[in-house]
Amino acid sequence: MKRFPTSAIAAIAAAALFGMASNASAQAAAPAGCSDDVPQRATRGNTEFVSNSQTVRGLLYKPTGPANGAAVVLLHSSEGLSVDAHSFDPHAIQLAARGYHVLVPNYFEARARQVPWNGRDVRLWAEAGHAAVAYMGTLEGVDPARVGIWGFSLGGFVATDGSAHPDSTARVAVGVGTGQDIFEASRGRRELPMMLIEGYSTFPIISAATMRELAANLRRRGATVEVQMLASPERSMTGQVWCEVFQHTRRFLDANLLPAAAPEAPAG
């Protein structure tokens, strides 16, 4: 499968979102970069779904080998998909190569970004996340009861706080570099597994303390929250940090979205 340089990925993503990606570029694999990468047996294409009468476009990754029946939605940060696409892409490819269906939506198409954002903005973004999860559950090869949602920074807050709402059908939620400094937590209550990931490399405003405040809030609202601190000493979101983030992400998704392995029969 043809490989594109990392610098080309953001351009490919932007082209796909505007309907200009050719079949060849949509299926081009991202460069490998982590020590545990598997062969890139996955495709990338463009798709769209509707949230509150707004069309939301995104990138859809599918396994070319056997699907595992699970799916995950990846939500970008406040910088937008055009900035985060090059960081997400190789890891979305790796998830798909392992059997997951993966959607990376441009959820700002459901509600344009403004600074500062307000409660209505956050609510509409959360509802776009709900719609993305529901959309993934309609795809062939996906069990609608095994769809998770993941987000980075603002996207992490939208994914976790939004999934605590009764309207969400996400089976699990993961937030990376997020906390209550993003926005005031909502009041919805829902029981589901969540994981919050924090490290030295996340934005200064998102400290471990504010992440733990969000974890405590989500627990009070019914979630079972795992807190994972990154081991990497890197002070920026380097490739090494992203590898560690997605290693923890895959472990959590596998544990909560995939069937437990059958115990081996006793010898003899």
What are these regions (language model features)?
Residues 119-140:
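Alpha/beta-hydrolase active-site loop
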Residues 172-226:
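The feature captures the conserved acid-bearing segment of alpha/beta-hydrolase catalytic domains
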Residues 142-152:
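Alpha/beta-hydrolase fold nucleophile elbow
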Residues 151-155, 159:
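Gly/Ala-rich beta-loop-alpha elbow adjacent to hydrolase catalytic centers
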Residues 67-69, 77-113, 204-206:
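Short substrate-entry loop that stabilizes the transition state in hydrolases
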Residues 221-268:
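C-terminal catalytic histidine-bearing segment of alpha/beta-hydrolase fold enzymes
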Residues 27-66:
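N-terminal cap/lid segment of alpha/beta-hydrolase-fold proteins
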Residues 73-79, 198-199:
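The conserved beta1-alpha1 loop
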